[in-house]
Amino acid sequence: AEIWAEDLPAETTLLQKLASTFALVDPRAAELVALCAGPRDALIAPSMPWLMDSSVDPFEAHNLRLLYGRWLVHEAMYDESLVYLASLEPKDVVAPATLLFFQGVAYHALVEKEKGLAVLRRLLDGAEQSPRRYAAVARLMQEDLDGVEPDTLHHIARRMDDIHRRLDLGRAGPKVRGIEDGVIDSLDKLIKRLEDQQQQQSGGGGGGIQSGAP
């Protein structure tokens, strides 16, 4: 009862208080809440398969998945966060704007343009019900993703940032190598385009020179 003694809080506080309520009766929830209360102390995110177990009450599982996914985003573990967040819908949780915001942050960080823009549009469509800071940051992420075009310097730079983040987390497997291969392919395409443009400009300039010989 003490947890709920205050007036109805904002949705982010509501999520935290709901999680604390689950923790009073479920030791697994208590462990998760304790984990999410501090920074990570390992490069590998703890697996929480029980959150995806259909035998767990959906109301508890969905909201704790949001709590855990939000924490994973804060820890820059974006792929891991989407394991828990991607399939959730706003109607599944007590903090719908928080869900859409952190889905958007993860997709933005991973440069998944279409998925990112889709969830950010949904968040901004209900901006009047969302925390102002969510709406403000969502507009910035939307503008950034709108400007991402395949094989441009912006796109290449964003993916290189993602590679550095993954390496900082100790990730060096097939996923990272695949992103690295994609960056190299994009660089090759960009260089080829620039070379073609230079050749066209040189050819156009050369074609306009008239010989002075009789």
Model-derived segments and their meaning:
Residues 1-214:
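Mature extracytoplasmic or organellar-lumen-exposed domains after removal of signal/transit peptides
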